[in-house]
Curated annotation (Swiss-Prot):
Disulfide bridges in this chain: none
InterPro entries: DegT/StrS_aminotransferase, PyrdxlP-dep_Trfase, PyrdxlP-dep_Trfase_major
Gene3D superfamilies (UniProt xref): Type I PLP-dependent aspartate aminotransferase-like (Major domain) (3.40.640.10)
MF terms in GO: pyridoxal phosphate binding; transaminase activity
Protein name: Uncharacterized protein MJ1341
Organism expressing this protein natively: Methanocaldococcus jannaschii (strain ATCC 43067 / DSM 2661 / JAL-1 / JCM 10045 / NBRC 100440) (Methanococcus jannaschii)
């Protein structure tokens, strides 16, 4: 079977430019706190800038031991930040272990949706960070449209394939409380952010934002159906926009899956694990989020399940 890959909103592509202030308002409507938004050319630049801010707070930053993003590992080295690796339950933060290892006046960065596979206990993490005066940085790329936006700082990619699928860009949001704490350092952040060249894609981003809840819900529902039918699928009880399936010889399994389920842009529909960005366990991630949501009706999902079951 050949499936359409995730595409940007067609109306947004036809009306790509737009009003930045409108987009900032819609972003804040989707989140649980209000943020001052800085638009950037990529999600990675947003993560880097958030860690640059973290260094103002402390020389140490905590990251999850899996289910994050490669930049969480690389950028602290560039900024001379010490990495404090937090032990997780397959990417999901264990609150007791976080309580034991999180130092006062430090920083923590994680993704709202661990490895795109399962949600973090964001409310509880926020509470613990407030008690310890820890700067909480939340990467909302995989969960915007769902329950997210609890961090002191949020970062988001609007590249591909993401919930906000503009094939370009990203943004950083700083909460009003953190803006006040940063004081004069806020001017340095503004100067640094201006070194990043950005384009006007706010018409497209607006359409993606307006569809974010529907997009997130569709990927969660499709992934749930697949998880319920595949024997070795993990995180059945959790929301996720992709599916981890434990297996031996994941490279071979991945090759077989991609021979039966193809994307029309010829990209792989699987991620081979162990992989820090997903999960450090043998298996594959079936990347539901790479499929265009227009394809995800019950008939197509059933065909996917039949194809996966014939291999696994």
């Amino acid at each position: 079977m050949i499936l359409k890959h995730r595409r940007p909103n067609i109306y947004g592509l036809m009306n790509k430019e737009g009003n930045k202030e409108e987009v900032e308002m819609i972003i804040n409507e989707l989140l649980n706190r209000d943020y001052k938004i800085t638009f950037l050319p990529s999600g990675s630049s947003a993560v880097f800038l958030s860690m640059w801010i973290a260094k103002i707070y402390s020389n140490e930053i905590s990251i999850p031991d899996m289910g994050g993003w490669q930049g969480f590992l690389k950028f602290p080295k560039l900024l001379n930040l010490k990495n404090n690796m937090i032990e997780t339950n397959l990417g999901i933060i264990d609150l007791e272990k976080l309580d034991e290892s999180l130092k006062e006046n430090s920083s923590l960065i994680l993704t709202s949706l661990a490895g795109y596979l399962a949600p973090q206990p964001l409310k509880e993490i926020k509470k613990l960070c407030e008690e310890r005066e820890v700067l909480f940085i939340e990467d909302i790329s995989g969960k915007i449209g769902g329950d997210c936006g609890y961090g002191d700082i949020v970062v988001c990619s609007t590249g591909t394939p993401k919930i906000l699928n503009c094939e370009y860009g990203g943004f950083l949001g700083i909460s009003k409380e953190i803006e006040e704490k940063l004081g004069n350092a806020l001017n340095d952040i503004k100067i640094l952010s201006k070194t990043y060249k950005t384009i006007n894609y706010f018409g497209l981003l607006k359409e993606e934002l307006l569809n974010a809840k529907k997009t997130y819900k569709k990927y969660v529902e499709a992934s749930k159906i697949i998880k319920d039918e595949i024997e070795n699928a993990y995180f059945r009880e959790f929301e996720g926009i992709s599916v981890f399936i434990e297996c031996d010889n994941p490279k071979n399994i991945s090759k077989k899956i991609n021979s039966l389920i193809k994307l029309d842009n010829r990209k792989s529909i699987t991620t081979i694990c162990p992989n820090y960005d997903r999960i450090l366990k043998n298996g594959i991630v079936f990347e539901t989020k790479k499929i265009d949501i227009s394809e995800l009706n019950r008939e197509v999902i059933n065909e996917i399940i039949i194809a996966l079951s014939s291999i696994l």
